[in-house]
A protein has these predicted regions:
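Active-site nucleotide-sugar/metal-binding loop of Leloir-type enzymes
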Residues: 50-62
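A short, glycine-/small-residue-rich helix N-cap motif at loop->alpha-helix starts
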Residues: 42-49
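C-terminal catalytic/acceptor-binding lobe
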Residues: 3, 154-357
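Short, well-formed alpha-helical segments that are part of the catalytic scaffolds
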Residues: 15-33
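Short, acidic, metal-binding catalytic loop of nucleotide-sugar glycosyltransferases
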Residues: 3-8, 27-36
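Hydrophobic targeting segments
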Residues: 9-16, 36-39, 69
Length: 357
C-alpha cells in the first residue's frame, strides 16, 4: 500500500496533554510503540494549538493528533496505517461520541456495512484525527490567534475550503478515558481488528434525513439537510419511515424493554425507551436500502453501534441510564433488539449470535 509519491504510509503522532495530564500522556505514548510520538503541553493560546498540528518529522506521510485522555485500541497504530493506505488523501476521524447527531448518521453507515461516513456537518470533537502532512502543516498555520471556535468545526471548514474529504470511521479506534460524564464512542471494539480491506471499502454520504434522539428529553426527532442554513442541518419532528412487519417490530420492542429495571425506574422511562427503540428500527429500515454488514468485523461494528445508542442519548432523559447497572442493562437490551430487528428484516425467526445482518 502506498500513500504519497509511492511511499508506504507512516504516521507521526502528537499527544495533547492539558495541565495535570502529563503522566497520562506518557503512558499513552508508551502504548503507541512503533510510532513517531511526541507530547505537546496544551494551553488556551493559539500557539499551543498550532504546535500539536505542526508536523515534526520528515519520515512521516501523515500526522495524527490525539488527546491524552483516551484509551487506544491495542492495535491503533497498525490500523491507522492501514486506514491511511486506503484513504491517503483524506482527513480521517477515528472517534465519534455516541451522543451527537453525527453518531446517528454513523450508525446508519454501520448498519449498511460501510467503514466510512462523510458526516452531516461539523462535529466539535476532534480527539483522534489524521491529516496528510502538507495539510496538517497548513491547518496549523491557518488558525488565527484568539479564535475560540471548536477545533472540529475549524477542521470541517478547513477541509471544505481545501477540497479535502473529511471522513468519520464507523469503527472508533479510541475511547474516552477521563473523569467526568462523557458519552462512550459510537463503536469502540478493543478486542476486534479490522481486516486491511475493510478500510478500502466505499464511503457513505450522510443521507438528507437521519432519525435521531433529542439529548435532553429522549424524544425521537429527524435531523435533516436544510440548504441555505448556517450549517446546512436542522432538527425537525420525527418523520414516519415505511415499516414492513410493524406489529412484529412493536412486539419485540415491548417484550425487550418493558420488563427492564431501567423502564421501571421512573414514570416516563418506558415511553422514552420505546421511542429510542423506534429510532433504532427506523435507522435499520433506512440502512437496509443501502446494504448490510458482512460477516465478521462489519457485523461487530453494527452490533456495537446499536448497543451504544441508548447509552449515548439517555443520560439526561432517564437518570437510571447513568448507573453502571442501568447502562449494562441497556447495552444488553439494545444489542438483543438489533439482533431481533435485523432478523425481522431478513425474514428469519432469530439469527445466531454473530450472524451476518
Amino acid at each position: 500500500v502506498s500513500a504519497q509519491g509511492g511511499e508506504p504510509p507512516t504516521v507521526s503522532v502528537s499527544i495533547r496533554a492539558a495541565s495535570g495530564q502529563e503522566r497520562r500522556a506518557e503512558q499513552l505514548a508508551e502504548q503507541l510503540d512503533g510510532a513517531f510520538v511526541r507530547i505537546c503541553r496544551t494551553g488556551a493560546d493559539a500557539g499551543a494549538f498550532a504546535e500539536a498540528w505542526q508536523p515534526w518529522t520528515r519520515r512521516a506521510t501523515h500526522h495524527m493528533v490525539l488527546d491524552a485522555a483516551v484509551r487506544p485500541h491495542p492495535r491503533l497504530v497498525a490500523q491507522v496505517h492501514e486506514a491511511v493506505g486506503g484513504r491517503p488523501r483524506a482527513a480521517l476521524r477515528f472517534f465519534t461520541p455516541g451522543d451527537g447527531y453525527a453518531s446517528h448518521a454513523l450508525r446508519l453507515a454501520a448498519f449498511a456495512g460501510y467503514p466510512w461516513l462523510l458526516p452531516p456537518g461539523p462535529d466539535p470533537t476532534s480527539i483522534a484525527v489524521v491529516l496528510p502532512i502538507p495539510e496538517a502543516a497548513e491547518f496549523a498555520r491557518s488558525v488565527p490567534a484568539g479564535d475560540d471556535t471548536p477545533e472540529g468545526v475549524l477542521l470541517q471548514r478547513f477541509a471544505e475550503e481545501r477540497g479535502l474529504a473529511l471522513l468519520a470511521s464507523t469503527a472508533d479506534l479510541v475511547q474516552r478515558d477521563g473523569p467526568g460524564a462523557h458519552a462512550p464512542a459510537t463503536a469502540f471494539l478493543p478486542a476486534a481488528v479490522a481486516p486491511a480491506e475493510w478500510w478500502r471499502q466505499d464511503t457513505l454520504q450522510a443521507p438528507p434525513l437521519i432519525p435521531v434522539v433529542h439529548l435532553r428529553d429522549g424524544q425521537p426527532l429527524s435531523y435533516e439537510a436544510v440548504p441555505g442554513t448556517s450549517d446546512g442541518w436542522r432538527l425537525r419532528p420525527r418523520r414516519d419511515v415505511p415499516t414492513p412487519h410493524a406489529r412484529r417490530f412493536a412486539r419485540v420492542m415491548h417484550e425487550r424493554l418493558l420488563g427492564t429495571e431501567v423502564a421501571r425506574s421512573h414514570l416516563r422511562a418506558a415511553a422514552v425507551l420505546l421511542g429510542v427503540a423506534g429510532v433504532l428500527r427506523d435507522q435499520l429500515l433506512l440502512a437496509a436500502a443501502w446494504g448490510r454488514p458482512s460477516e465478521g468485523f462489519g457485523a461487530a461494528v453494527a452490533r456495537e453501534s446499536a448497543a451504544t445508542l441508548a447509552l449515548g442519548t439517555l443520560a439526561e432523559a432517564v437518570p437510571a441510564a447513568r448507573r453502571p447497572d442501568g447502562a449494562a442493562e441497556l447495552r444488553e437490551t439494545f444489542e438483543a433488539l438489533y439482533e431481533e430487528m435485523t432478523a425481522i428484516l431478513r425474514g428469519s425467526p432469530r439469527p445466531e449470535r454473530g450472524a451476518d445482518p
